[in-house]
């Protein structure tokens, strides 16, 4: 039996763990589902501390649990957690800029909820520069019961797939 060492698999090229899609690889109507993520008390506390959202409703669990049944999660945290699932899987290494984002909250999200999202490509638009394009998407975020808790519409600038002549060693 042959053993494999790190040197055996080493190369000069980095191997991306998550590689995003280029602008040219998307089609309007295409849909992608993220993995699921449970929102924990620690997530809420860290977000409140970083964002400065020191609202009584988020800080005092006892004051809101009677009304909602559990501690509420700010909509901004829900959105950022979904961005944290979308960006590494669809846009890693290809996303250049978030150009526009609009969120609509439909139902409350609470500590202990598990969320995921479906990303639907709604628009593909080239830019003046041939190395990039704009992707529009509608993101539907659902909880563990399948209830849509938030929808987002975004526009992002992505790079296009490099032409073979642009890749080092490719045909000229």
Describe each model-derived feature in a short phrase.
Residues 36, 82, 105, 119-121:
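Conserved hydrophobic positions within beta-strands
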Residues 92-99, 104-111, 117:
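Mid-chain, well-packed structural core segment of small domains
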Residues 2-27, 109-114, 118-172:
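HotDog/MaoC-like acyl-thioester-processing domains
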Residues 70-71, 93-95, 107-108, 128-131:
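Short histidine-centered beta-strand/loop micro-motifs
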């Amino acid at each position: 039996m042959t053993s494999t060492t790190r040197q055996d698999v080493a190369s000069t090229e980095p191997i991306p763990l998550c590689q995003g899609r280029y602008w040219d690889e998307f089609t309007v109507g295409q849909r992608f589902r993220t993995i699921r993520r449970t929102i924990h008390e620690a997530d809420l506390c860290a977000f409140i501390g970083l964002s400065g959202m020191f609202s009584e409703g988020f800080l005092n669990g006892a004051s809101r649990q009677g009304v909602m049944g559990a501690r509420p999660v700010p909509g901004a945290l829900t959105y950022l957690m979904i961005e944290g699932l979308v960006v590494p899987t669809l846009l890693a290494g290809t996303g250049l800029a978030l150009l526009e984002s609009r969120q609509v909250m439909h139902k409350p999200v609470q500590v202990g909820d598990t969320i995921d999202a479906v990303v639907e490509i709604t628009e593909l638009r080239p830019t003046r520069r041939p190395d990039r394009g704009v992707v529009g998407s509608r993101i539907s975020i659902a909880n563990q019961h399948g209830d849509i808790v938030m929808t987002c519409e975004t526009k992002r600038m992505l790079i296009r797939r490099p032409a073979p002549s642009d890749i080092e060693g490719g045909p000229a």
